[in-house]
């Protein structure tokens, strides 16, 4: 359940895909921002997966797809893989890249707002990839300009392009994205990759999530609500990885993120809670891939790297390919020689799947600001951008859960009066 959608409209319970032709789906991402994968349909996700496979085997053919295009990478916090992946993706498509790596290298160090930065940069470029430490920053960017914005990670909130890499890796290993038991281990509170992956897998349905974390780093309620709202998905929570590892089809490890902690002693106490070794993998299924968004610290021992189940470096390659697919798609630039294959043949149960409130899981899932929300509402999340850029208008949506609570449009946290 995600409010940070760049496309605002009412929710629809019918499936759009039944009326889409292949060409319509292939062109339907043109000009679109992607703050969360909830912004796009499952058919569009399948299209991106299909395009990435084509790109991988047709590097020369796609090398001029984005000739004349310019990508801005606005990275307000450190990144190696994601920034280089976005930049390499555009370069391999024939485009160019400008940007900065670190807020200290931009006018943000002088106090410039995200809104103003985007209004300036959008005059120079065709598409923007933005990473920011504040949750909801990418949503702010989409409200400021019409240039397509791709969220490269907003605080501990969402990371949609990492999820695309994760989906590609899981699909390559299993040939499907459902009927799986998926373990997610480590920092589930601030792990934006975990939040994005759970929310997206829920849309494909029939997934059992095993949430493995210390009590201090449990999954946020808005993500749990999403699982609860999906009739075909279930979850369990545990502190003990070894107790459940034998039943997992996929294990997604995460690092405990020092940069998200305000209490260093708590970080030091929690950082080594889970360390996956080759010995521990002996209890796992022989086909269970180990995923990790990287960077790792010591939560996966180096001796695991040579195990055929280690899939985290595959994710890196898949991330670049998926970003190539996404960048070209939002720009409306056709891949030379590409013809859609079977991505439109979405399984009927996926087309018909609805959540507990009758909302289609296949269609984009968007929320609108509730103009009748109480005026005294505020977002209690200290990591939300509305609590640092105080000129931003507070916006809230009414959650679909039976509790009828309001949530922040920027970060999805439950609002407080």
What are these regions (language model features)?
Residues 2-4, 13-84, 88:
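Positively charged, low-complexity intrinsically disordered leader regions
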Residues 64-171, 298-301:
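Phosphate/diphosphate ligand-binding glycine-rich loop within oxidoreductases
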Residues 76-89, 171-253, 402-414:
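Glycine-rich phosphate/diphosphate-binding loop of Rossmann-like nucleotide-binding domains
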Residues 227-304, 309:
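Rossmann-like adenosine-cofactor binding region
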Residues 287-288, 293-345:
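Adenosine-phosphate binding glycine-rich loop
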Residues 366-417:
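Cys/His-clustered metal-coordination modules, chiefly Zn-binding fingers
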């Amino acid at each position: 359940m995600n409010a940070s959608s760049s496309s605002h409209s009412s929710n629809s319970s019918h499936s759009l895909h039944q009326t889409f032709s292949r060409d319509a789906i292939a062109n339907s991402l043109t000009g679109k921002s992607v703050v969360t994968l909830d912004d796009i349909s499952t058919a569009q996700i399948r299209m991106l997966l299909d395009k990435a496979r084509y790109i991988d085997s047709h590097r020369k053919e796609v090398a001029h797809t984005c000739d004349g295009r310019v990508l801005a990478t606005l990275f307000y916090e450190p990144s190696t893989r994601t920034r280089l992946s976005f930049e390499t993706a555009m370069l391999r498509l024939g485009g160019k890249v400008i940007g900065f790596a670190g807020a200290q290298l931009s006018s943000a160090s002088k106090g410039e707002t995200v809104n103003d930065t985007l209004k300036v940069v959008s005059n120079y470029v065709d598409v923007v990839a933005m990473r920011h430490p504040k949750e909801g920053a990418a949503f702010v960017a989409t409200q400021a300009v019409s240039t397509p914005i791709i969220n490269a990670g907003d605080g501990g909130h969402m990371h949609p392009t990492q999820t695309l890499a994760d989906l590609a890796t899981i699909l390559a290993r299993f040939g499907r994205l459902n009927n799986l038991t998926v373990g997610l281990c480590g920092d589930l509170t601030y792990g934006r990759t975990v939040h994005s992956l759970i929310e997206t897998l829920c849309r494909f349905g029939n997934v059992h999530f095993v949430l493995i974390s210390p009590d201090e780093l449990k999954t946020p309620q808005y993500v749990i609500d999403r699982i609860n709202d999906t009739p075909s998905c279930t979850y369990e929570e545990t502190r003990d990885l070894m107790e459940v590892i034998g039943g997992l089809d996929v294990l997604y490890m995460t690092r405990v993120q020092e940069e998200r902690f305000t209490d260093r002693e708590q970080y030091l106490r929690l950082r080594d809670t889970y360390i996956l070794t080759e010995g521990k993998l002996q209890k796992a299924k022989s086909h269970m891939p180990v995923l990790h968004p990287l960077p790792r610290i010591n939560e996966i021992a180096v001796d695991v790297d040579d195990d055929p189940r280690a899939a985290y470096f595959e994710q890196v390659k898949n991330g670049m390919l998926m970003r190539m697919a996404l960048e070209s798609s939002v720009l409306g630039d056709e891949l030379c020689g590409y013809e859609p294959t079977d991505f439109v043949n979405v399984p009927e149960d996926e087309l018909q799947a609805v959540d507990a409130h009758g909302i289609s899981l296949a269609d984009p899932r968007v929320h609108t600001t509730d103009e009748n929300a109480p005026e005294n509402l505020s977002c209690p999340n200290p990591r939300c951008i509305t609590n640092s850029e105080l000129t931003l208008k507070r916006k809230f949506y009414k959650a679909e859960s039976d509790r009828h609570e309001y949530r922040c449009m920027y970060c999805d946290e439950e609002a407080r009066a």
